[in-house]
């Protein structure tokens, strides 16, 4: 099992993430440095923060190519070495204790499931929980939810490497929504699920996604929804919702999420 973490000029966030990979977690860790210039990856310091049962590996891209390229380079490395499972984590986000073992157990008990996610606790930069976003759990619930948005927290997923033989890797034509596109393809070829438990802490940085970046993400989402539309009422409603969000400020959207999802979920 390989835990894939892309990195770009955020060593402190990386160290927080590596600190959360507990000594009892059965995984190797691959950090892909996406051409960091201001804060190049310090392998020795990273290794000091990684206490996993397995090994820490690093892969450096010669230049900054974007998260899709970094993730796909990591997936190529992982597939070449024959890993059966891939889990994701992003710099700054932190595993809850037992996250890796819990998802491995789930996939072993459900051989028809190709992708499994879980809930995330949204925390501020001080680590204080703001809210937990509930997600659909079953395959049918997820297929319905995909009409509106991704049904998975990207840094909280684990999937079978072999599913990539059918879906391909992260697409590059949907910037900032590459995960939404890939996970929809996975849901078409196999069963998918979310464990109804909080598996990670997701760092909510108001400056991490610029206004232009958020617009790009929503525009990509709209393209994915249109590509997968079956003309149903649910599909049309999902497209309309995304178009409304294109005119909604980011902070307002976060406040609505926190109102609808109080901080009480396990």
Residue locations for each model-derived region?
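Conserved donor NDP-sugar-binding/catalytic core segment of glycosyltransferases
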Residues: 98-130
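Glycine-rich, basic loop-to-helix element that forms the pyrophosphate-binding segment
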Residues: 61-81
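A conserved acidic beta->alpha catalytic loop
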Residues: 33-44, 63, 90
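Short, well-formed alpha-helical segments that are part of the catalytic scaffolds
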Residues: 10-23, 42
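Catalytic beta-strand/loop signature of glycosyltransferases that borders the donor
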Residues: 119, 180, 193-199
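Catalytic core of nucleotide-sugar-dependent glycosyltransferases
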Residues: 140-145, 202-205, 211-235
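Acidic donor-binding loop at a coil-to-helix junction in glycosyltransferase catalytic cores
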Residues: 176-182
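Short beta-strand-to-loop acidic/aromatic patch adjacent to the donor-nucleotide binding site
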Residues: 83-94
């Amino acid at each position: 099992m390989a835990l894939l973490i892309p990195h770009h000029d955020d060593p402190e966030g990386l160290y927080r993430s590596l600190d959360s990979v507990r000594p009892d977690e059965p995984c190797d860790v691959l950090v892909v440095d996406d051409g960091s210039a201001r804060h190049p990856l310090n392998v020795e310091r990273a290794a000091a923060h990684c206490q996993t049962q397995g090994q820490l590996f690093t892969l450096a891209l010669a230049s900054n190519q974007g998260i899709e390229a970094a993730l796909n380079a990591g997936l190529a490395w992982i597939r070449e070495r024959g890993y059966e499972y891939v889990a994701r984590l992003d710099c700054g986000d932190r595993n809850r204790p037992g996250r890796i073992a819990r998802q491995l157990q789930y996939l072993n008990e459900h051989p028809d499931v190709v992708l499994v996610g879980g809930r995330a606790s949204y925390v501020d930069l001080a680590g204080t929980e703001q809210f937990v976003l509930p997600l659909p759990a079953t395959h049918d619930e997820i297929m319905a939810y995909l009409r509106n948005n991704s049904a998975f927290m990207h840094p909280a997923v684990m999937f079978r490497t072999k599913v990539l033989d059918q879906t391909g890797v992260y697409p590059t034509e949907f910037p900032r929504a590459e995960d939404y596109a890939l996970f929809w393809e996975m849901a078409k070829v196999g069963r998918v699920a979310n464990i109804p438990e909080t598996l990670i802490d997701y760092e909510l940085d108001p400056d991490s996604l610029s206004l232009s970046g958020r617009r790009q993400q929503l525009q990509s989402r709209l393209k994915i929804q249109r590509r997968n539309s079956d003309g149903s009422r649910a599909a049309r409603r999902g497209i309309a919702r995304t178009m409304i969000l294109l005119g909604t400020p980011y902070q307002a959207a976060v406040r609505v999420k926190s109102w609808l999802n109080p901080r009480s979920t396990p």
